Amino acid sequence: MKWIGWLLLVGLTHVAHATPLKLAAAVEHTAILRPFIHDWFGRAGIDFQLIPCSYARCEKLIEADHAVDGDMARIKGFDQTYPHLLQIGAPISEVAIYGQPRDNPSWPPAKGTVIGCLRGIQWCERFLGNYQVIWLNDEKQGLAQLHRGKVDWLIKMRPASQPALASPWQKITKEQVFLYLDKKHRAEIAALLKVQLVFINNGRWLAMQKQYLSAI
């Protein structure tokens, strides 16, 4: 696995910095994942600061130079869009992808279906290439577009540890979520991977997931 190479390249040095790593943190995940990140980073001796934002605003911060040092929770493949980032080891949680149909509740929909996605939901970019996707600013706008017949489906994402959404929302799939950091933070990445490996081997990683993320 590529992240093991980082351990070999950088070593296993304990890291502590006066300046905390700034992590873009989608507001849907902040309260749930903060304790998990606190335990992980704390054991590695790394300070951090969460920057709450919408999914779309978080991506703007990632694109801006020196605005943040990474993203707290994104699905696999986020580094393909932002190659200066590195996926840090094993998944930390899961997100559920929900869809609300206008008429036909069958998923996947037929070709030509117009799908509305809230801005910043990477899953739509990766898996809906065969459909016409309309990007929406928020759920309120999305529901309005759905009810007016401007879109056939509305897609949203939320932590899988939260209660399932009621009908007419349908759970389409679940995706694993990872921490992503700027590759330039080599020492911090190595320290986090070292701690993660220890936590996985001694069962602490799973225990943290069960403690903080009850659905996993």
Task: Tell what function each PLM region has.
Residues 39-43, 103-106, 110-113, 117-119, ...:
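Extended ligand-binding regions for polar small-molecule ligands
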Residues 51-112, 119-123, 160-172:
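Acidic, polar ligand-binding/catalytic clefts
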Residues 49-61, 134-144:
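Short helix-initiation/N-cap motifs at beta->coil->alpha
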Residues 46, 63-73, 147-156:
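Alpha-to-beta junction loops
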Residues 21-39, 101-136, 142-144, 148, ...:
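Bilobed "Venus flytrap"/periplasmic-binding protein-like clamshell domains
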Residues 3-12:
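Sec-dependent N-terminal signal peptides
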Residues 91-98, 163-197, 201:
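Periplasmic-binding protein-like
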Residues 12-18:
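Sec/Tat signal peptide C-region and signal peptidase I cleavage site
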